[in-house]
Regions:
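An acidic, phosphate/nucleotide-engaging active-site surface
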Residues: 1-6
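Short hydrophobic alpha-helical module
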Residues: 7, 38, 165-169
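Gly/Ser/Thr-rich loops at beta-strand to alpha-helix junctions
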Residues: 7-13, 211-213
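Short Gly/Thr/Asp-enriched flexible loops that form oxyanion-binding sites at enzyme active sites
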Residues: 10-23
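A mobile, often basic/glycine-rich helix-loop segment
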Residues: 26
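A conserved active-site cap/scaffold subdomain adjacent to cofactor or substrate pockets
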Residues: 29, 33-154
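C-terminal non-catalytic interaction/assembly regions of soluble proteins
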Residues: 124-282
């Protein structure tokens, strides 16, 4: 075929495939794909839309920044190996793993870095990744801020009060209500080691998920607004300890969750995918 149009099993595979097709070692081909997968993310200073040239030989891989104000350095190229990786030294593919633990980086010109030492470790069998997601419901989002120290100290009680008001309206099932407390544990949740040391200000994001937009909006609105009226010990007022940057809650994209995250061993990886050859043009 002169032109191939298809999906990709990984970003790196798009660039590794032609190198493998022309007989280059998988050790270098897969690293070539890895370094080129996000264009100039492997260069500095940052410029995500710029171009990088990758060169492969029997001995090494070389990455050169094409923009005159960018350069591929030892730090930028090796740092890109950590991109979207829980382990910066390895990346898994359908038929094996790229081991980067022994990579050596050499600055051979101002804009070019040379890479050696990568190893591709093939698996005995090819594994095809299966991923799936399912829609949970429609979603609305609301925001509020808290500056009052007493309310910050009792923010869980404030959230609990709001949840009870939603429960009084909708019961306990048929919707989801989520609170992210930024300034305390909004990013890491229960894994946050400094959860007992909140900041002097908190931002709370409220997400309501329900089968319909109307219900999701109301769940979110009640879950947000009722924080304003939360009853706390030692507070004589009836409202006012929460500030709202917006008058409304905002319609967001639908909520989805993972339903499938698996790999399946296959004897022939192409058996799962249809291939069509079409003659185009005159």
């Amino acid at each position: 075929a002169d032109v191939i149009i298809g999906g990709r099993s990984s970003d790196a595979a798009v660039f590794a495939a032609p190198a493998l097709h022309h007989g280059f070692a998988a050790d270098h081909a897969y690293y070539l794909g890895k370094v080129l997968e996000c264009a100039s993310f492997c260069a500095e200073p940052y410029g995500g839309k710029e171009t990088v040239m990758g060169e492969i030989s029997r001995q090494d891989v070389r990455a050169t920044a094409m923009h005159p104000q960018q350069r591929c350095t030892i730090a930028s190229v090796s740092g890109h190996a950590m991109y979207e990786r829980s382990n910066p030294y390895e990346e898994f593919f359908a038929g094996g793993k790229l081991d980067m633990s022994d990579c050596h980086y050499e600055q051979i010109s101002e804009r070019t870095t040379r890479i050696t030492g990568s190893r591709f470790l093939p698996d005995e069998r090819v594994r095809v990744k299966l991923e799936g997601a399912g829609k949970v419901g429609e979603r609305y989002v609301g925001l509020c801020g808290i500056r009052d120290p007493y309310t910050i100290a009792h923010v869980d009680a404030v959230i609990g009060w709001a949840r009870e008001q939603v429960k009084a309206r909708f019961g306990t099932t048929g919707y989801e209500l989520h609170y992210n407390v930024y300034g305390r544990d909004g990013v890491m949740g229960a894994l946050e080691p400094l959860r007992d040391q909140p900041g002097h200000e908190l931002c709370i994001m409220v997400q309501g998920v329900a089968p319909t937009r109307e219900m999701a909006e109301e769940v979110t609105m009640i879950g947000l607004r009722q924080m304003f009226y939360a009853r706390l010990p030692d507070v004589k007022g009836t409202a006012g300890s929460v500030a709202f940057p917006l008058d409304e809650v905002l319609h967001a994209s639908p909520a989805y969750r993972w339903t499938l995250n698996h790999t399946i061993e296959v004897d022939d990886p192409m058996a799962l995918f249809s291939t069509h050859l079409v003659e185009a043009g005159i």
